[in-house]
Amino acid sequence: MKKIQTLAMVMGLMVATANVAPAQGIGISTGGDEAGISMDAGGKKKKKKKSSKKKATASKVGKAVGKLKTFNGKPSKKALVYVYLQSASWCGPCNQEMPEVASVYQEMAKDGRAELVLIGCDQTEDGAKKFLKQYKAKFPGVLSTAKNVDKLPGFTAAQGIPNAIMVDAEGNVLANGFPSAVLSQWKQKVEELEAAAAEGDADNEE
């Protein structure tokens, strides 16, 4: 009888021990709070750090070209260099320049650091579109009479066409003249701007 009582007591103790919850908790994420809260192994609340990454913002010129109602695509808002090309389908010298302009733009678009926008001097948008299509030009365009063209930083209406104005992202004029001559400088100007920016960052760290 004593052996049976002893065995019953041992079994009861084992059952009671099995029903006790472990001391350490399991990680839980609430998911409802923007910052986020989780539970560590000891059951304490631990706040998740918010990301400190800032979204890249458009430059002064980037914002301005973004307001244009362009055809043949949308201009980049984050280029380092912009070229305003004033040209028209009825202009002989403009037609002579267009094959080279279209070719150079392919390099610019592939690189991603420079953008070109046609400021078309045709009377109609259809005329300007056909002009671009004729030379398989992939850059965006807008008529010179369109809204907000006169507000483009660094832009001035040329007395004669074709004409190209190259500006940095803040609208400072880097070059102004015949398109082929201006476009031949785009990569050099981009590299100069990048070098100046890197030098400025180095000075700020000192």
Where are the language model's segments positioned?
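N-terminal targeting signals for export/organelle localization
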Residues: 2-66, 199-206
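Hydrophobic beta-strand anchors of alpha/beta hydrolase catalytic cores
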Residues: 82-84, 116, 164
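A short beta-strand-turn-helix
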Residues: 59-82
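Thiol/disulfide oxidoreductase modules built on the thioredoxin-like
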Residues: 137, 146-189
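Extracellular/periplasmic catalytic domains that process cell-envelope and extracellular macromolecules
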Residues: 75-77, 109-111, 134, 156-160
